[in-house]
From Swiss-Prot:
Its cofactor is Zn(2+). This is Methionine-R-sulfoxide reductase B2, mitochondrial. GO terms for biological process: actin filament polymerization; protein repair; response to oxidative stress. Residues 1-41 form a transit peptide. It comes from Danio rerio. The active site is at C167. It comes from the Eukaryota. Pfam families: SelR. GO terms for molecular function: actin binding; L-methionine-(R)-S-oxide reductase activity; metal ion binding; peptide-methionine (R)-S-oxide reductase activity. It is an enzyme of class 1 (oxidoreductase). Zn(2+) binds at C88, C91, C144, C147.
Amino acid sequence: MSRFLVRLSTVVSKGATGKSVLPQKRIFAGIRLISSSTGLQSLTRYDQSTDWQRKLSPEQYVVTREKGTEVPFSGIYLNHNEVGMYHCVCCDSPLFSSEAKYDAGAGWPSFCEAHGTWEKDESHANIVRRPDNSLGSTGTEVICKHCDAHLGHVFEDGPDPTGQRFCINSVALNFKPREK
């Protein structure tokens, strides 16, 4: 393990900028390097230097980067029924299959499971769940595993067999139809 950490710090230091050569505070959290310097970047995540405000529309930016929520019943994918895959608008990771989409009547596109889920195991899915207390009650936020984009929330009031309702903002998604 120590050889791995030495090798990891060598790889990271080769990409260091002038600012990051100065002494800095580093914390190893699993394989992800977290640094107080702007010169170091995560080895497992989307490029942190991405200019999201330039890449995204204002509404996409507010929802995905500032944890906003689009107006209910306004999203382009709410009543969308085409067969295909919904991807992260920020990093293009596949998130939800149209086969898992259903009408929950909640005002946002709803899915019963994330793409890559196998018998409730989401380790191969491109989403992460996080506790969210921002609305005054405990909920579960859904974010993109690769770029930390806020996607929406998940609730335990969905249909069988999963019992889950992923309530996802349309502006956080791009749809790609299935090739024929």
